[in-house]
């Protein structure tokens, strides 16, 4: 099956170009960005729990093992495997516990992933955050990379804040300044996020991070 990518096009890009000269320059330098999405809500939640506090490469290694072992990643296959087998795939006990707890809620009808589709962004973040192991940042990433919501802009994402510092030459991004950019990019914050992530990852080599270096400890 071919990969699915976050959907955006000239409508979103034209809006962002008109709203912000610097972001316009970034968009023109980088071009179109293909970011894969996972439209399966259950598997997306599991994938994001696996990825917490580890590298993307490590996340994909564990995820691939899980798919090879379980076949379809579903509430039934997760619960049939159990915590010890999930741990054997390379995840921590805590993550295995979170994933099986989530699977149990889905199986028992206490959590309906498909109901998220009809919720507002705030409602969906709140519902996802009620799950063990899911915080606001993880919930926002699920909204962006699974539900493909167009207006997600996560203050808790360190790379987004780094990208803002690099593009706009800020030393620090506090909540008030962050919200100013959210208002500027809305209703297409998700597309803006893709470009800020790219900048933070080094897509434009001459751009640097203006965050002050921490003073060295005295010996």
Name every feature range the model reports, one short phrase each.
Residues 11-71:
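A positional/architectural concept
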Residues 37, 57, 61, 73, ...:
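Alpha-helix N-cap and coil->helix boundary residues
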Residues 1-33, 97, 136-219:
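C-terminal accessory module of base-excision DNA glycosylases/AP lyases that mediates lesion recognition
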Residues 22-26, 54-55, 59-132, 184-186:
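Alpha-helical ds-nucleic-acid-binding substructure associated with the helix-hairpin-helix region
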Residues 31-33, 40-43, 52, 89, ...:
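Flexible, active-site-adjacent loop/turn segments at secondary-structure boundaries
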Residues 44-49, 81-85, 123-127, 141, ...:
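A general alpha-helix detector
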Residues 46, 63, 100-103, 196, ...:
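Short, amphipathic alpha-helical segments that act as regulatory/interfacial helices
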């Amino acid at each position: 099956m071919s990969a699915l990518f976050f959907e955006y096009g000239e409508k979103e890009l034209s809006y962002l170009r008109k709203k912000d000269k610097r972001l316009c320059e970034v968009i023109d330098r980088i071009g179109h960005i293909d970011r894969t999405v996972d439209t399966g809500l259950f598997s997306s939640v599991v994938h994001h729990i696996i990825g917490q506090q580890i590298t993307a490469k490590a996340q994909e290694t564990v995820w691939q093992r899980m798919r090879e072992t379980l076949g379809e990643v579903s509430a039934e296959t997760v619960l049939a495997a159990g915590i010890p087998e999930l741990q054997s795939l390379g995840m921590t006990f805590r993550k295995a516990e979170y994933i099986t707890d989530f699977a149990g809620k889905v199986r028992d009808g206490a959590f309906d992933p498909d109901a998220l589709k009809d919720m507002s962004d705030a409602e969906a973040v709140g519902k996802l955050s009620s799950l063990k192991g899911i915080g606001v940042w993880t919930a926002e990433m699920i909204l962006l990379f699974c539900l493909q919501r167009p207006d997600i802009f996560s203050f808790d994402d360190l790379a987004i804040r780094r990208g803002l510092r690099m593009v706009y030459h800020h030393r620090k991004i506090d909540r008030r300044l962050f919200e100013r950019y959210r208002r500027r990019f809305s209703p297409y914050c998700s597309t803006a996020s893709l470009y800020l992530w790219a900048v933070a990852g080094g897509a434009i080599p001459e751009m640097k991070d203006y965050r002050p270096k921490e003073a060295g400890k005295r010996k």
